[in-house]
Amino acid sequence: MFSPRNIRGVVISGVAVVAALTPTAGQSAAASGCFTVSGRYTEHAVTGPECRAPVGLCIAGTYRGDISGSLRGSAATVTPTADTPATSVLTFTSDSTITGAVKGNRGTLVVKNAGVFTTLPDGSIVDLQTIVGGTGRLAGARGFVRASGTFSAVSGGTSEYEGSVCVG
């Protein structure tokens, strides 16, 4: 027969087994192929015949940190808002690729960007980078990266980024 003492021992053992087999949040993310990423990138404007952007603005640059590699992008839109005369802020959308690695997984990320930037001398920029695909070990990648920093078409810029990239 089961005594209260035996039942208590079985329950404690069962709880210990369940706790040992339950993945932590970090283990769960790794098992699903999701990675928290952070770092910085530098970028500069690209002009000439290799820039085929509808609005004439292309960029190239380098990512460092959990995402590392080369960046190429082209602006699809640059749009003033009703407040642009007072704020000097414009919105933009762009398409870009990052060829390199995410935490050692090599390939190319395909990214759709949406953000805002100021035309004032400090060049503040905020960018939401939506990862919509990839190649190589980054095939099927999805995720979001938030970036903020500075950018000028004349001098380029630097931004810090953080977000999450899921692969597979």
Regions found by a protein language model. Give the residues of each.
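Bacterial N-terminal signal peptides that target proteins for export
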Residues: 2-12
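C-terminal region of N-terminal signal peptides and the immediate post-cleavage residues
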Residues: 8-10, 19-34
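Beta-strand-enriched cores of mature, soluble protein domains
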Residues: 29-168
